[in-house]
């Protein structure tokens, strides 16, 4: 029973038998808490339950929660691999009571589990309690038989938990195990409590107060329980090891790393193996929960974790991408407990493979840049922190790698300046991700739902229905009536209007009654099943309790249905063409068009898009019925139905099946599953696939790293789009005097010819600007013993000025070139180049600044051998060159 998977099952089964609902782990991306970057505790998904604004169908629960601590206040990243218990990813086992049982039962349940089920010796156990919590101390004496020496009173915040400045709070009791005198350290509360001998493994939080304001606490009428046990710590205890990395799960991962790099762990490399094993877990679970590597927010943290692991693979001698080859081992070890890991295996592997390939290029590029930036630094000097951070932030070159690369030369890094730049980046990252999850739902909806109940949705079967108004809102506050000319929100007992969700926009239409007409401009869902209609009252008055008729805009709903069904066909066609790693990451299903985002690491070419469109239309032409069926969620997944990222599913789900399997040519074939597409979906769909009419893919684009966006049209809109394209193509053929089939080739030839002529023209202008191909005897004058070539050039692009300056320096051999380029709109660009032998005497930056003011510019920048500036006043070109000549004469 000491394996990680067995321990998890024992914990959950124990509390299930004690009447707790077993609640699946929530996503690592918090859905209702914009203050958190990642889910970092078991209670996060129950926060609204603890505060009383949300009710669940159970009053006590248990879970094994996925947690990540690698950003924000809870950041263990830099310690991972170098200590026995720090992780970026870990599982928190917990049991929770929402006003059901309290201290006595919580302590009794915990004691029975650890001593009877887990078999821990009571003699090795001890606890801490909050200094003022006499009740908890008495319960430990009674239930566990502990003496006062084994009940340690702690008066600090370590044993008093608060959700925030206000809200539920209460004392804690932590359970410790004495691992024996062979390990250093003293009991909790002693000066050497940070040693390894006494290990805390379970924290029981007794939420019995509400913090009203600083210094003011009230007792809660129904106190609650929140506990958290680290699964990895408990596994180490039960397996008799003193490091989490020596448990069965981590041993399997570390063995996989050793096999992949063909190198056995040694004491000097142990930290690298641990880093890779830990980061593989956090990386894989974050990708499975929809986070992809990027340069901001959660994706920024993910990329940092990934690249830290990849850096350690590099230290172990890996020269090709390796990390993706470790994913199957992780899925084998944890995929049964977390099915999302197995479902996302292809995406995780491909994302890791591509990211590691990019990182290896980053290493090469970063080392080259580092060499350039430190050419003038001697041993004992420091590289600037800003430069080190630019290497890290722009090029993904880690600080530790920069330090390692410079260590052999005796060069350090200004880490204070680096930390300051990092702080600015973290603040920018926090601004990017804060609120990117679902905003915390307004409490007003909880009150309405408690009073009116959930809205019954009738829209699968009808587009019109009678209903009774249960609530009205205007400007966010409940009202009794809405009058003509007023805008507001209507909540009814039932509705045919679809509420925006799953990417499908909400319905529009009308609400009517005797002397009443209101226009519904949109429909949303709150709290999962409370439908809210945004309305403008055009005639009469809407009143709470009134009976009304709700009618959906039929034409708009029909277009939305067609587009939603088309997304299912396109999604499956994309998987068939691109691979099983493709997963939908978001969508917009509107009446005019559809778009959806998929996980795919590179652009989708025209040939692939064409095949996708052909496959989807081939299935459409089957005109097969679209079948919907209600099933248990586990049964649906086992049957092959695809669950979409970001969607929440209840115990019972709606499964939508479409079409018969086809091959890449659109021919019907026998498939592994009976249908072409099977997805969990709560949206509205066509009855027969033929109702879609036609699917036209408009194109694809990048949304972020590893995410592509597909846009398409259906039905009449698709036909009109194709007709417009056809007319445009015919017009092009007429202008080119070529058959339609030859238009691409003719256009390509013309474009290449234009490029050739433009290059010839640009080269000719450069030669004219610099005095012809042969140069000239009078092209430079001598000032203060130095040759100066100073010239105003016209008809030359600003980007070409540097090239001309380099050409001038070559002609001179030794000297200075000053060029002013004046554009057609009168703006000017100034470039000064100094040959290498003169850079000790003259600085191109100073010379540029001498002339820039005459062009209306400020300053200038560059290096000693080449600098540039610009300004709005090209009329000052001659004066600028004269000023440079004067500066040269002044020495």
Curated annotation (Swiss-Prot):
The keyword Signal does not apply. Its cofactor is Zn(2+). The keyword Metal-binding applies. It is found in: Cytoplasm. Zn(2+) binds at residues 564, 568, 681, 685. GO terms for cellular component: cytosol. SUPFAM superfamilies: Class II aaRS and biotin synthetases (SSF55681), Putative anticodon-binding domain of alanyl-tRNA synthetase (AlaRS) (SSF101353), ThrRS/AlaRS common domain (SSF55186), Translation proteins (SSF50447). Gene3D superfamilies: 2.40.30.130, 3.10.310.40, 3.30.54.20, 6.10.250.550, Bira Bifunctional Protein, Domain 2, Threonyl-trna Synthetase, Chain A, domain 2. Its EC number is 6.1.1.7. It catalyses: tRNA(Ala) + L-alanine + ATP = L-alanyl-tRNA(Ala) + AMP + diphosphate. Its main location: cytoplasm. GO terms for biological process: alanyl-tRNA aminoacylation; negative regulation of DNA-templated transcription. GO terms for molecular function: alanine-tRNA ligase activity; aminoacyl-tRNA deacylase activity; ATP binding; tRNA binding; zinc ion binding. Binds 1 zinc ion per subunit. Keywords: Aminoacyl-tRNA synthetase, ATP-binding, Cytoplasm, Ligase, Metal-binding, Nucleotide-binding, Protein biosynthesis, RNA-binding, tRNA-binding, Zinc. PANTHER family: ALANINE--TRNA LIGASE, CYTOPLASMIC, ALANYL-TRNA SYNTHETASE. Consists of three domains; the N-terminal catalytic domain, the editing domain and the C-terminal C-Ala domain. The editing domain removes incorrectly charged amino acids, while the C-Ala domain, along with tRNA(Ala), serves as a bridge to cooperatively bring together the editing and aminoacylation centers thus stimulating deacylation of misacylated tRNAs. Belongs to the class-II aminoacyl-tRNA synthetase family. Catalyzes the attachment of alanine to tRNA(Ala) in a two-step reaction: alanine is first activated by ATP to form Ala-AMP and then transferred to the acceptor end of tRNA(Ala). Also edits incorrectly charged Ser-tRNA(Ala) and Gly-tRNA(Ala) via its editing domain. This is Alanine--tRNA ligase. It comes from Methylorubrum extorquens (strain PA1).
């Amino acid at each position: 029973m000491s394996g990680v998977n067995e321990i998890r099952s024992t914990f959950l089964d124990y509390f299930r038998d004690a009447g707790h609902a077993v609640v699946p782990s929530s996503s690592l991306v918090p859905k209702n808490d914009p203050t958190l970057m990642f889910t970092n505790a078991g209670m996060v998904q129950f926060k609204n339950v603890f505060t009383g604004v949300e009710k669940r169908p159970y009053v006590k629960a248990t879970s094994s929660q996925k947690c990540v601590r690698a950003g924000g206040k809870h950041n263990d990243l830099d310690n991972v691999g170098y200590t026995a218990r720090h992780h970026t990813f870990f599982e928190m086992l917990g049991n929770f009571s929402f006003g059901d049982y309290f201290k006595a039962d919580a302590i009794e349940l915990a004691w029975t589990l650890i001593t009877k089920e887990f078999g821990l010796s009571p003699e090795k156990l001890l606890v801490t309690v909050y200094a003022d919590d006499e009740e908890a101390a008495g319960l430990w004496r009674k239930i566990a038989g502990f003496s006062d020496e084994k009940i340690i009173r702690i008066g600090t915040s370590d044993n008093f938990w608060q959700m925030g400045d206000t809200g539920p709070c209460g004392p804690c009791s932590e359970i410790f195990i004495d691992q024996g005198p062979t390990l250093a350290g003293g009991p909790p509360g002693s000066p050497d409590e940070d040693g390894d001998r006494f290990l805390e493994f379970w924290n029981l939080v007794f939420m019995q107060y509400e913090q009203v304001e600083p210094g003011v606490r009230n007792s809660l009428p129904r106190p609650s329980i929140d506990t958290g046990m680290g699964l990895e710590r408990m596994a180490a205890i039960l397996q008799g090891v003193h490091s989490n990395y020596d448990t069965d799960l981590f041993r399997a991962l570390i063995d996989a790393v050793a096999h992949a790099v063909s190198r056995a762990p040694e004491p000097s490399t142990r930290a690298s193996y641990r880093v890779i094993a830990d980061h593989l877990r956090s990386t894989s679970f974050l990708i499975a929960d929809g986070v992809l590597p990027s340069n901001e927010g959660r994706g920024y943290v993910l990329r940092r974790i990934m690249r830290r692991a990849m850096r350690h693979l590099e230290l172990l001698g890996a020269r090709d991408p390796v990390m993706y080859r470790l994913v199957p081992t992780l899925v084998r070890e944890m995929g049964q407990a977390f099915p999302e890991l197995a479902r996302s295996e292809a995406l995780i592997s491909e994302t890791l493979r591509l990211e590691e390939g990019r990182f290896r290029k980053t290493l090469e590029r970063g080392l080259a840049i580092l060499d350039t930036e430190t050419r003038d630094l001697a041993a004992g000097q420091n590289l600037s922190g800003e430069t080190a951070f630019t290497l890290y932030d722009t090029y993904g070159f880690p600080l530790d790698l920069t330090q390692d690369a410079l260590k052999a030369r005796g060069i350090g890094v200004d880490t204070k300046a680096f930390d300051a730049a990092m702080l600015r980046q973290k603040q920018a990252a926090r601004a990017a991700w804060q609120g990117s999850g679902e905003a915390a739902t307004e409490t007003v909806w909880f009150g309405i739902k408690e009073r009116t109940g959930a809205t019954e949705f009738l829209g699968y079967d009808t587009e019109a229905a009678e209903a009774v108004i249960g609530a009205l809102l205007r400007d966010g506050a409940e009202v009794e009536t809405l009058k003509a000319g007023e805008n507001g929100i209507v909540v009814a007992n039932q509705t045919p209007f679809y509420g925006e969700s799953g990417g499908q926009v909400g319905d529009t239409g009308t609400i009517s009654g005797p002397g009443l007409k209101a226009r519904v401009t949109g429909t949303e869902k709150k709290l999962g099943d409370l439908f809210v209609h945004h309305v403008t009252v055009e005639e009469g008055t809407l009143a709470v309790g009134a009976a009304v008729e709700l009618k959906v805009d039929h034409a708009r709903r029909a277009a939305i249905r067609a587009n939603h069904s088309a997304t299912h066909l396109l999604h499956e066609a994309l998987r068939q063409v691109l691979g099983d790693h493709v997963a939908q990451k978001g969508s917009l299903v509107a009446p005019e068009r559809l778009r959806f985002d998929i996980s795919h690491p590179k652009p989708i070419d025209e040939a692939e898009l064409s095949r996708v469109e052909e496959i989807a239309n081939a299935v459409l032409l089957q005109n097969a019925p679209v079948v919907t069926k209600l099933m248990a969620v586990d049964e649906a997944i086992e049957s092959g139905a695809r669950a979409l990222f970001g969607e929440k599913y209840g115990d019972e789900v709606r499964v939508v099946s479409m079409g018969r399997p086809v091959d890449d040519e659109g021919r019907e074939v026998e498939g592994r599953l009976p249908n072409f597409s099977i997805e969990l979906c709560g949206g509205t769909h066509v009855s027969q696939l033929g109702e879609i009419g036609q699917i036209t893919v408009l194109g694809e684009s990048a949304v972020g790293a590893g995410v592509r966006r597909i846009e398409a049209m259906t039905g009449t809109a698709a036909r009109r789009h194709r007709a417009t394209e056809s007319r445009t193509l015919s017009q092009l053929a007429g202008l080119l005097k070529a058959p339609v089939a030859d238009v691409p080739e003719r256009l390509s030839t013309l474009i290449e010819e234009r490029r050739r002529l433009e290059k010839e023209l640009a080269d000719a202008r450069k030669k004219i600007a610099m005095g012809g191909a042969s140069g000239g005897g009078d092209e430079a004058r001598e000032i203060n013993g130095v040759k100066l070539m100073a010239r105003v050039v016209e008809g030359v692009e600003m980007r070409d000025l540097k090239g001309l300056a380099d050409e001038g320096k070559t002609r001179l051999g030794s000297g200075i070139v000053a060029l002013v380029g004046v554009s057609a709109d009168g703006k000017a660009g100034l470039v000064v180049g100094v040959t290498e032998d003169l850079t000790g005497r003259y600085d191109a930056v100073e010379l540029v600044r001498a002339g820039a003011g005459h062009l209306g510019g400020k300053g200038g920048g560059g290096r000693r051998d080449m600098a540039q500036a610009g300004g709005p006043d090209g009329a000052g070109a001659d004066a600028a060159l004269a000023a440079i000549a004067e500066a040269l004469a002044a020495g």
